[in-house]
């Protein structure tokens, strides 16, 4: 047989045959399952009482027990446990079965020292490694650490290159004549407007997220993730614009707020130059990723957030990017013009950035605190949508700070 050993990473095995009977479809191959204890997508079943059980109960279920008993009906058999290798002779060959059950979530299995150790242990045992190395002897974390350094360096380059371009003759008209000082909020009403607008924006983003993601991902498009997140981004951008308009006419204008002085109101020429500068910064900055990929076969990433080189066919998906314009432009205006004030002192930017990222923090907190404490997800039907927020936390926070 071509395949000697199989380790299913956060995926279910085949437990029954075509007729629905318990079966050992793997024969005398060595087979294991990496079953994250809090997996959001696999290892679920309905128990004898008709109760739907999620991944934390996997080891107590009939599927796992049949698997560990080499495909027989587990009824009446002694319960088998995780992280223990079981052997049985099949067709003259000793085969093994094992389930690893680390206390992690699905995406963490691809970024976990425990999961990596289990993979090494499995194949060391299954393939009878002649000179085994301890499974704890892992160095991939260093690679990830330096990938993250590259990610930080990319962000620094974007800011530095964009700033440098403002000192060129073509774009110097976009640069402020002097260092812009934060606006002084002189009364309690102004402070209330500041905090309430930030809170309202965060609440709006949280409340519509699951609904708009379900709507967007149900559309018949090639990129459902981009569509769902893009629609969410657009609606949040529109809400931010409306918030700024309401603030301006209800408070700002009455208290001497000058849109031209703040840079909100600009000429068409400056608007065109701003768009051109943005395009140049994007092309040059992302060009660095292609250079790193070509010469060093490296990219910049940390866990679920990555900047990668891509091939030409991917360019057809570029129009999805326009769905994100409303949010990031309005966020830039809000951060630099409407919320840049003396509230919070030197931490003003951090406050605004935290509030921008708050929806992407709170929703996963609710999901996983519920999951870990009850054994059932808060929003099982939105499990993937909640996971998509993991990189967005860093994106929203960093983009606001970079603004």
Set out the residue ranges of the language-model regions.
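Soluble extramembrane regions of membrane proteins in the secretory/endomembrane system
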Residues: 1-139
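A generic "functional-site adjacency" signal
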Residues: 113-116, 155, 396
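Short secondary-structure junctions and interdomain/linker hinges
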Residues: 126-133, 152-155, 159, 168, ...
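Juxtamembrane/start-of-transmembrane alpha-helix segments at the extracytoplasmic/lumenal side
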Residues: 137-151
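Juxtamembrane interface at the cytosolic side of transmembrane helices
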Residues: 152-199
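Alpha-helical transmembrane segments of integral membrane proteins
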Residues: 192-403
């Amino acid at each position: 047989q071509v395949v000697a050993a199989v380790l299913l990473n956060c995926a279910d095995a085949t437990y029954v045959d075509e007729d629905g009977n318990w079966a050992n479809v793997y024969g005398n191959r060595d087979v294991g399952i990496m079953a994250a204890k809090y997996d959001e997508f696999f290892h679920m079943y309905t128990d004898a009482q008709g109760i739907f059980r999620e991944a934390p109960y996997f080891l107590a279920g009939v599927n796992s027990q049949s698997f560990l008993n080499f495909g027989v009906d587990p009824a009446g058999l002694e319960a088998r446990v995780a992280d223990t290798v079981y052997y049985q002779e099949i067709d003259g060959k000793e085969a093994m079965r094992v389930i690893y059950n680390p206390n992690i979530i699905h995406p963490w299995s691809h970024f976990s020292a425990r999961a990596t150790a289990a993979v090494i242990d499995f194949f060391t045992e299954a393939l009878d490694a002649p000179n085994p190395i301890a499974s704890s002897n892992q160095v991939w974390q260093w690679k990830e650490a330096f990938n993250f350094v590259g990610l930080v360096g990319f962000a620094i380059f974007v800011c530095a290159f964009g700033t440098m371009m403002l000192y060129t003759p073509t774009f110097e008209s976009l640069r402020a004549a002097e260092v812009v000082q934060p606006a002084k909020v002189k009364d309690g009403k102004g402070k209330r407007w500041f905090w309430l607008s930030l809170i309202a924006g965060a609440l709006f983003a949280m409340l519509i997220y699951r609904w708009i993601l379900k709507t967007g991902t149900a559309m018949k498009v090639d990129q459902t993730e981009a569509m769902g997140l893009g629609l969410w981004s657009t609606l949040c951008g529109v809400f931010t614009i409306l918030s700024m308009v309401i603030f301006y006419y209800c408070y700002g204008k009455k208290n001497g707020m000058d849109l031209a002085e703040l840079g909100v109101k600009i000429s068409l020429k400056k608007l065109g130059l701003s768009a051109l500068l943005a395009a140049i910064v994007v092309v040059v900055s992302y060009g660095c990723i292609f250079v790193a990929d070509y010469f060093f076969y490296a990219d910049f990433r940390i866990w679920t957030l990555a900047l990668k080189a891509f091939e030409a066919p991917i360019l057809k998906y570029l129009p999805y990017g326009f769905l994100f314009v409303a949010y990031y432009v309005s966020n830039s205006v809000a951060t630099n013009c409407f919320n840049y004030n003396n509230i919070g002192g030197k931490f003003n930017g951090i406050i605004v950035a935290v509030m921008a990222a708050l929806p992407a923090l709170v929703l996963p907190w609710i999901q996983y605190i519920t999951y870990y404490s009850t054994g059932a997800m808060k929003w099982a039907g939105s499990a993937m949508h909640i996971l998509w927020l993991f990189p967005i936390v860093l994106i929203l926070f960093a983009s606001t700070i970079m603004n």
